[in-house]
């Protein structure tokens, strides 16, 4: 998906990172089991964050094992899975499918069309199971596409619609925590959308693609404007997050929310300001485990 909910590894304890990594690898294994290699390819920071948060909140009974994977055959990784991992895998696969469909719709990316087609077939069993969620998400995406077609530059409006998608993703159960999870997912979705739009605006304008910031990206105060918009939504997300009774994973989840989530934004801001260096996390080898990104800093799918 988007890949902004990543850890700031230098600020983590080793045991916190190992715990996070075990959820990441667990999600990877379930994606492969349920959706094959295509599902495994969709593995994302977003899915790992969702999985880690819900597993802690609902105190799911973990099954812990070790395995080697194709990417790192010489090293065994701890794998942590439970019933919540299944849900996170379902949401990860569905949102990846919608993202690939959007890539094909916007840019005619052949890879997006192929992966979306494969995922469409592999997620058919989820259509009835999550019919209500899918209906809300599909409607929000359709509304976003209509705004794009109109050319209207409305960053808050677009962020609001993507927030509706993520609200559905985080609403795991109809219970006492649903209202907080919905608010959290909604605001996190807005943050992620705005960060992605900020990072991509120059490339989008150059290639003639829609971007909600295209009217303001040349302003001298653009970074401050975008940062302020994002901060408002992130603060509201954090307020909802802190109302959840999280224990085991709360430290690394806070690391992501209060620090890691800003890494790519700060890199993009540094490039635009012409800075020779940017003070950001050195998230180790980008091809290793949950820290792998492509050459542009975007997240890649892959194994644990």
Question: Model-derived features: where do they sit?
Answer:
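Acidic catalytic motifs of isoprenoid enzymes
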Residues: 1-183, 190, 194-231, 239-249, ...
């Amino acid at each position: 998906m988007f890949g902004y909910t990543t850890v700031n590894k230098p600020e983590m304890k080793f045991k916190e990172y190992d715990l996070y990594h075990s959820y990441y690898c667990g999600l990877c294994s379930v994606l492969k089991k349920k959706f094959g290699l295509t599902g495994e390819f969709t593995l994302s920071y977003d899915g790992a964050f969702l999985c880690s948060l819900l597993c802690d909140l609902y105190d799911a009974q973990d099954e812990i094992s070790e395995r080697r994977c194709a990417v790192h055959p010489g090293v065994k990784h701890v794998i942590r899975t439970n019933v919540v991992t299944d849900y996170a895998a379902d949401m990860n696969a569905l949102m990846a499918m919608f993202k690939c469909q959007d890539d094909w719709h916007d840019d005619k990316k052949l890879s997006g069309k192929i992966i979306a087609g494969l995922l469409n077939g592999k997620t058919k069993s989820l259509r009835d199971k999550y019919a209500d969620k899918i209906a809300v998400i599909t409607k929000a995406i359709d509304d976003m596409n209509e705004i794009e077609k109109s050319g209207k530059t409305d960053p808050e409006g677009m962020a609001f619609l993507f927030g509706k998608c993520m609200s559905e993703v985080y609403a795991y159960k109809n219970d006492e925590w649903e209202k907080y999870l919905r608010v959290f997912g909604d605001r996190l979705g807005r943050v992620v959308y705005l960060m992605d739009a900020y990072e991509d605006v120059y490339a989008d304008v150059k290639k003639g693609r829609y971007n909600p910031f295209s009217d303001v990206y040349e302003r001298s105060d653009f970074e401050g404007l975008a940062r302020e918009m994002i901060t408002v939504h992130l603060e509201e997300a954090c307020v909802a997050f802190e109302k959840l009774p999280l224990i085991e994973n709360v430290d690394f989840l806070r690391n992501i929310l209060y620090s890691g989530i800003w890494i790519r934004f700060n890199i993009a801001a540094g490039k635009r300001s012409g800075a020779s260096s940017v003070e950001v996390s050195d998230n180790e080898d980008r091809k290793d485990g949950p820290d792998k990104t492509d050459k542009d800093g975007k997240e890649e799918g892959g194994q644990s």
